[in-house]
């Protein structure tokens, strides 16, 4: 039996990592299948090394196409080494970001084109898509303010981009979720975290009742 693939998307500072941790703290013991938690870029030894290159603020001369290809390379390794084996074992895979982030950040934010970046990632992943995607919706100004308060002076290369870039990324996410309305669930990430977590859990119970 194939497992389930659930991704969490959103602008920087939306709280994806925190929400995912809180959700699994609450429902992890109740889940029937085993589950795996992973992230992008990264998720495997090789992919984590590529992550370091992508996000290092010292690499400020990185070309947009290079950036997109590095994300796709990390994702290809991640999928083949971690995600596909877990799904084939019937596990639930929860991923902090997946292809949709590249469509928003590189496709729209870097002006490479959503369709063009999708083609690169279709090749990298063998056209693997999540079964369910949570989009944590927050204005980029608010998200970046959260990061600056949480990690002052420690922003990564993409977090350090100007607000115009982050607004384009946000608009990219809006376009992407409209392309895949069947799997996207939008949640207001400006709510208290308990409310966000409860809405995620309620959606999982409704959309994937067989995992409980």
UniProtKB/Swiss-Prot annotation:
Q: Does the keyword Transferase apply?
A: yes
What are this entry's molecular-function GO terms? ATP binding; dTMP kinase activity
Keywords linked to the UniProt accession: ATP-binding, Kinase, Nucleotide biosynthesis, Nucleotide-binding, Transferase
EC number(s) reported in the record = 2.7.4.9
Task: Name the enzyme's class.
Answer: transferase
Family that this chain belongs to: Belongs to the thymidylate kinase family.
Name the UniProt record assigns to this protein? Thymidylate kinase
Which species does this protein come from? Answer: Lactobacillus helveticus (strain DPC 4571)
């Amino acid at each position: 039996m194939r497992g389930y693939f659930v991704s969490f998307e959103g602008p920087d500072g939306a709280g994806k990592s925190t929400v995912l941790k809180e959700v699994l703290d609450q429902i992890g013991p109740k889940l029937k299948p085993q589950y795996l938690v992973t992230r992008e870029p990264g998720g495997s030894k090789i992919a984590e090394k590529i992550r370091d290159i992508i996000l290092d603020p010292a690499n400020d001369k990185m070309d947009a196409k290079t950036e997109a290809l590095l994300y796709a390379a990390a994702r290809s390794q991640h999928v083949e080494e971690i995600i596909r084996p877990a799904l084939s074992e019937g596990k639930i895979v929860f991923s902090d970001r997946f292809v949709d982030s590249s469509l928003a950040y590189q496709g729209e934010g870097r002006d490479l084109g959503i369709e063009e970046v999708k083609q690169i990632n279709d090749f990298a992943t063998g056209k693997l898509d999540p079964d369910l995607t949570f989009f944590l919706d927050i204005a980029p100004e608010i998200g970046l303010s959260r990061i600056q308060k949480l990690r002052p002076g420690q922003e990564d290369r993409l977090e350090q981009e100007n607000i115009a870039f982050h607004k384009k990324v946000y608009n990219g996410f809006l376009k992407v979720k409209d392309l895949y309305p069947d799997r996207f669930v939008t949640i207001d990430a400006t709510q208290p975290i308990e409310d966000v977590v409860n809405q995620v859990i309620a959606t999982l119970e409704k959309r994937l009742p067989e995992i409980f």
